[in-house]
Every structure is written in C-alpha cells, then in structure tokens.
Amino acid sequence: MRTLTLLTALLLLALHTQAKSPQGTAEEAPDQEQLVMEDQDISISFGGDKGTALQDADVKAGVTCYCRSTRCGFRERLSGACGYRGRIYRLCCR
C-alpha cells in the first residue's frame, strides 16, 4: 500500500512538473493538444537509500517507468496503471 501511494505521488509530481513547462500557446485547438499529449511518454525514475519504502517493496534502484497509451516496449513489463487528464494508461517499467 505504501508503494502504491509513493508511486502515485511520484507520478503526480512528474505530471505537475510537465504541466508547468511551456508547451505552446493557449490558442491551440483542443484536438491538436490531445494528440500531442498522447504521443508523449512520462518518465519516472526511482532511486534512493536502502531504507526507502520502494526498496522495502523489492523495487530496485534505477527502475524507470513510463505511462504509455500503447503496449509496453521491448524489455518493459506492465507494472500497473496511471491516470492523466481523466484517462487510464499502462505503467510500463524496465
């Protein structure tokens, strides 16, 4: 349960950081903006001390996860789900 909470917090932090970066003008058409957002991957990296909750849950340091709208890539495995703007995506980790 702690792992899920920590993963969710990291995902929300990554999404918040990405949302703050300027990605174009506000006059873009919503359909065009949606297409751009679907093509982008969100990278989440895990690391830290040996005493972290992620390490306690058998998650190794250096694991990188992506929130994907399509299937997981080569050498990635499905590790759960992530949500963005009301849509559910695959959480793929390597």
Swiss-Prot record:
Keywords: Antibiotic, Antimicrobial, Defensin, Disulfide bond, Fungicide, Secreted, Signal. Residues 20-62 form a propeptide. SUPFAM superfamilies: Defensin-like. GO terms for cellular component: extracellular space; secretory granule. Its main location: secreted. It is found in: Secreted. GO terms for biological process: antibacterial humoral response; antimicrobial humoral immune response mediated by antimicrobial peptide; cellular response to lipopolysaccharide; defense response to bacterium; defense response to fungus; defense response to Gram-negative bacterium; defense response to Gram-positive bacterium; disruption of plasma membrane integrity in another organism. It comes from the Eukaryota. One of its GO terms (molecular function) is protein homodimerization activity. InterPro entries: Alpha-defensin, Alpha-defensin_C, Alpha-defensin_N, Beta/alpha-defensin_C. Transmembrane segments: none annotated. The keyword Cytoplasm does not apply. Residues 1-19 form the signal peptide. The keyword Hydrolase does not apply. Disulfide bonds join C65-C93, C67-C82, C72-C92. Highest expression in bone marrow and to a much lesser extent in small intestine. Belongs to the alpha-defensin family. Active in vitro against S.aureus, fungi, Gram-positive and Gram-negative bacteria and to a lesser extent against an enveloped virus. This is Neutrophil antibiotic peptide NP-2. It comes from Rattus norvegicus. The lineage of its organism: Eukaryota, Metazoa, Chordata, Craniata, Vertebrata. The gene is Defa.
